[in-house]
Amino acid sequence: MISNKRKEIENINRHHEKDNDDDDSDGIDNGLLTYKKFKKDFDSGSTNYRELQIIAKSLGLASNGKKQLVYNRIEGYFLSKKVKNNLTNNETNQQEEKKEEEQQQPQPQEKQYILTFKDVEPVEIYFWKVFRNIVIFKHIFSNFKNKQYGYYDLIGCNGVFLNGKSNSMEIIIDNIKSNNNNQIIRNKYNITNIINKFKKNDEKTRSFYNLLFSRYSSTSTSLPIQLSSTIQFDEDIDKWIQRMIENVNFTALDQFIKFFKIDSEVIKKAIKIHVKPSVFGNTTYDKLKIYNYLKSINSIPTSHKLLPFISTDLSAFLSFDNKFKKLIKSYKRLIESTNLQERMEQQEQKEKIKIHPNNKKYYEKLNQKILELNEIQTSQFTNDQLNSTIKNLLNHTTPTSTSTSTSTSTSTLTLTLTPTTNLTITTSTASNNINLKDIIKKFYKSICLFFYCSVYSANERLFRKPLLYYLNFKKESVDKMYERVVNKWNGRSFDHQLFFQSILKDINIEKNEKFELILNVLDNKYVKTFEEYDHYIFFKAVFSSNDIELIDYFLKKIKQLQLNQTQKITKYPSIGKLIGDYCHLIDKKEILDFYFQNYRDECLFFKDQNEIWKQIQLELIEHYEYLMDSIGKRCKLDFYRWFDQNFLDRLNIAILKPSVYSIGFDGYFDIVSEGLVDSNIKDNKENSIINFLSNAQLKHPLSLEIFESSFNPYTSKMLTFIKFLFNNISKESIETKLKVINLKTDNKSFEEINSKIELTTTLTATTTTTTTTTTTKTTTTTTTTANLLSPKKSKDVGCLTIGKTESFNFTISIRMLLVCLYNLDRVDDIIYLFDKLPEVLFNPDYFSIFTNEYCIYGISSSYYLELFINYFIANINDNTINYLYNCLCIASKKGYTQIFKNIISSDQNSKYLLKIQTKSNQSSLFNSKLLNDIVVKSINSLNFELSNLLIDFIDFSAKDKNSLKMKILKLK
């Protein structure tokens, strides 16, 4: 037996390159090992580990890892080959059939050839003709601003790109269709990110995945040659099935199976080898959809039967924030996934006794509920109802009659406990009067019973229905429901909060019952279960209801209780403190008016010079100002809570209305100004900063050290602010400031050199308008000329001068000055400054940081990067050679292949840049190690097309070339 295996292995080594892996063959055809022969003769347990390694190597597979891993790798290879052969055979048969049909058709006297484009609109053909013409393409895009943000430079589909661009799918589709050398998708990790991102089950997403599979398969003729060897779905079928299941993407998995016509046995094997059984144990709504789908096409291996929902979060299925249609689908997926009748029988056999009477009772209840739901027709559900949340439906439920629906077919919910469970939900024209709340309750009850029978029957203590289930479906008094909270939920603070808020906001509960609840809490009826220090939970529930009647009743009862208490014993806070503590919950003007008319003397936020106004929601500030102005009172603002989220917005409001606000800042405000700018940039509040700087003059220059640490993460958020800062700053004024640095460099020691410069931003009506236009495009807040340039009179308030600001100063480092100019598309100005002041800008202490990889990598485009490279080549010196090398490293890391192709096409540049410096070639700039590092960066970034281009062109030794190629093979 061993000798026979040895012969087979030798045959593999001699013949494995031949493509004859037909799974239906009875033996080894022409000496080749087939899937059946492999499974028959090479058992994972008895086969020698060394023999498996030889087979793996002969097939071009990795041979490292444990024995079972190597075995699974070989098995997966054969499964993929089977799918590929089936796909090829199908296409061959279709081509032969098509050829026969064409031969049978009468031949025209003169042949006419028509080029057709599948799935492409006629007008789109002209677009692609322009798009693929590099000369026209570059000419068009050279006229666009913000070239560094052009999508044609995007390399790789990472989370930043996929989540940061709302049209990321369209960009990928355009890039695939363009079929140019600059492909966004570079490797399998990019594909995995795509699978993790696009999961919606609609026609657009399904079409997207079909395009993806057609381009990245071994039969594709459109794919660039360099990518076809690294990404082929049909060469790695089992691994892609694993990735789609683990990323819980039903749409991709469904289209993948259909596109490549993968049979159930291949899917079963792939799941068994690569997907852990526990994946389906932690059951979610979306995982259930995949599980039921695989089950419906008979593709679930016996080892992966759905575990009994051990790690399932019941609250996710029963959330009242879910849409009604999701509740129906949850019910469907749960019931379809499990044969409850079979589970009952298995439990009886396992225990060798009849099932516990209580458990049997629950199974019977569930069966009864399923039968009841089978009788429900869904014609009374409108699209609005199906797309509404359960919470909203329960707050507006009335008996509903039959309503118009988009479908006219008739069927019912059909569910049984038999192995052939079936469920359909369509519409019927039958007239019906059914209470929607009762229907929702039946679905909830069924899901609860299902989980109890499947998971919690062995330990009833662990099972409890959500609190909202009792609050919405149990027809009990408020007192009775509160007892349930205490008995079933042990009276936790969170449950008390949920209970009080739900009761007080429920429009279906009578006001008298709510009044009774308030009275019972204040009279200590629940003192044993509701501690006094937890009263703030109840207070918050009352004020958050924003119900004037409830709040008024509550405050009057508090007042009565306080009158009955001695001065030394004050159980509850004062009325004024209560209202002030919860004023942030006020969400409508009527509540403010209510306090103003009835509790003005008690309310702290109606006092003169109060600071509590900062807690009132910004949407209500204008009405609040009107009330304060009507009684001649003012609010106070200092910088004590400068880090609050809306502080700068409130400061801008206060600056514009000095009759209502008094502002007082001492010298410490200069210290916190940087943090204020930083926090508002992170919160996308660039307009708030611009408003502030336009209406308040700092007595010291604004330091922009924040740019040093925060520029990279917040580049797009800062763009409007940067435009505002540099709008009226010319390159000549920057040159003047840099000349001062140059003088200091010549005459002072290094320690005395100040690497920062101070610039002045001039504010004019034109500046304001420009800023406003830009801001309007990028944010929802609009800024007008009027509110930027008022008030007219200046006023000193400590370290600030409030009033119309004509200009302000700021300091910025030379490095960040260059970065800002770059992001404003003022690269021509950078080149101008290079020429005028090379001794300053090319000073390693200043400029080297700008060209460091971590800085320029995040902002560079191929367009500008090539511009810098060409400039450094034309101005080579001891400093610029280092900057040139850094730019080449970035181009390699980002996969800008065209930059290197342009260098190679130039005989002079290629000799300087991409040939190794030796004794015989002193004209070259870089030694072997530096050039090797450039190639390694492209390999580590999985840009293999560029890697192979550089390996072939650079005159590395044979040893170095082999070493680099091995790095590529390991990452493929």
From Swiss-Prot:
Region (Disordered): 1-30
Domain named SAP: residues: 44-78
Record keywords, A-Z: DNA-binding
Highest taxon of source: Eukaryota
InterPro entries, per database record: SAP_dom, UPF0746_actin_org
GO molecular function terms attached to this record: DNA binding
Biased composition (Basic and acidic residues): 1-19
Homology family: Belongs to the UPF0746 family.
Protein name: UPF0746 protein DDB_G0280785
Source organism: Dictyostelium discoideum (Social amoeba)
